[in-house]
Structure formats: C-alpha cells, structure tokens
C-alpha cells in the first residue's frame, strides 16, 4: 500500500544477494513503510506502485545509489512480472545492478537526475560530503549528531541472508532513515535548504540546484552572470575551459 498520494519521504535501501529492502518514513506523519523482496515475500508490485506515487524523496547519497537502484527496479518491473520471476531471481538482478552502480560511482550514472521517477534531495551532496576534504559517512554523521544509536551493518552486504538476519537488517536500515531524518531536521540543513530555495527563486536556477554544494552554486551563478553580460551560451563557455594537470603557483602569485 501507499501512505498517501504525492508525499515526500526519507528513505534508504539495502541490497544483498538474496534480499532487497526498502524503508521510507513520511516527513509529515512519521509513518514508516517497508517493502521486502526475499524468500516467499515479493513486494515488487507494491514497491513500484509506491515509488510512482511519490512527490519527492530525501536520502543520503541517494542520487548516486538508492534512486539509481529504484529506477532500475521500475524499468524492469513489467519484464520480471511477465517472466514470472520469483524473489530470488529478482534480487539476483538487483544485486548485480547494485554492484555495477557502486563500481561506476563518480564516473557516470546509469540514470540522470532529470530522468528519475521523482525529485531527490541528497543531503550528502548538498553538504558537499562527496568532496575529499569533507567526506563523511552516515555512520560518522550519527556520531557527530550524538544520535541515540550508531550502528554498523550486522551483515556482510555481499552475502546471502536468513530469515532471522532479515530482522537485524530491518533494524539497521530503520536506524539509518531515522538518523537521516534527524540530519534533515537539523538547523544547519534547514539553513542550507532555505538558502538554495531563495537563490533558485531569485536567479531562476533549476530544481536540482537544491543538491548543489555551496561552491557549485557560486560557480554556476558566476557562469550565469557572465553569459548574461556577454550574451554567450553557457555550453560554449564550458568548452573553453583549459585542462591542466598541474599549476605552478609561482606563475599565479606575483
């Protein structure tokens, strides 16, 4: 079932060789919803119906991973149903795509942000945690937030699980979405979101600018102002960039 039509939820997924788990929490009602593909339980239809009903999702590194896997599932739903795939066959396909997505991360994505099933807010990207100097995991964030529990996965994600281990996995995933929710509601995050909303409205930035880091917002605004002043096309200006393997500081500083 779906919680309601066109709502926004905070979510996380777990992918193992023989199990797919999706947990989401409604940002308004705090109701948690669960979908599982494992053993005798196959929530594929309900999961896809739920994903198509969403107005937006909030996660941590969800642009590069969670939303990619969910889009893959949506794209293959009809084929799996037509071929009457059982849960083990579906999870095998999902696990394979999950590994491919992890291996291609930071190179290119299978599905661009504009082609995803709903809008995404990625707290990981917005706070620029994908920068080498600021890199932060959700577990590290839980510690920094003094969250009530900082849990490491009780299961090897490259393994298959048992029925008893599924309960542990659900508890682990639930802790992740609750800590993501706490970070979403943190004052620092609220300020960053309001800043981006204001800039997007004032300067007609695209909706996905909410996921831009502060430095990217600055560079995009400079490009916008420059193109408006020179009447140049932003795509053409980007092509004029000089590729450099190194910079001699003595040539830059007098």
Protein language model features and the residues they cover:
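A short acidic-Thr-Gly-centered motif at the start of a beta-strand
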Residues: 1-6, 49-51
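Conserved "right-hand" nucleotidyltransferase catalytic core of DNA-directed polymerases
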Residues: 2-3, 14, 136, 144-152, ...
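Two-metal-ion RNase H-like nuclease active-site motif
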Residues: 6-15, 120-122
């Amino acid at each position: 079932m779906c919680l309601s039509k066109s709502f926004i939820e905070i979510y996380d997924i777990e992918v193992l060789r023989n199990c797919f788990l999706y947990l989401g929490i409604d940002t308004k009602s705090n109701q948690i919803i669960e979908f599982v593909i494992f053993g005798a339980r196959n929530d594929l239809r309900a999961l896809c119906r739920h994903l198509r009903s969403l107005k937006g999702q909030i996660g941590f590194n969800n642009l590069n991973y969670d939303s990619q896997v969910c889009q893959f599932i949506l794209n293959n739903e009809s084929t799996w149903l037509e071929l009457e795939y059982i849960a083990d066959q579906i999870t095998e396909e999902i696990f394979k795509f999950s590994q491919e997505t992890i291996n291609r991360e930071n190179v290119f994505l299978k599905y661009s942000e504009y082609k995803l099933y709903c809008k995404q807010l990625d707290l990981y990207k917005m706070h620029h945690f994908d920068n080498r100097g600021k890199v932060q995991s959700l577990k590290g964030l839980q510690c920094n937030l003094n969250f009530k529990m900082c849990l490491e996965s009780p299961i090897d994600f490259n393994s298959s699980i048992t029925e008893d281990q599924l309960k542990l996995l659900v508890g682990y995933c639930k802790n992740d979405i609750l800590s993501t929710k706490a970070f979403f509601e943190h004052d620092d995050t609220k300020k960053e979101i309001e800043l981006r909303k204001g800039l997007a409205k004032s300067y007609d930035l695209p909706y996905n600018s909410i996921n831009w880091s502060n430095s990217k917002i600055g560079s995009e605004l400079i490009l916008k102002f420059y193109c408006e002043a020179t009447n140049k096309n932003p795509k053409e200006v980007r092509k004029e960039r000089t590729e450099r393997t190194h910079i001699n500081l003595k040539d830059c500083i007098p």
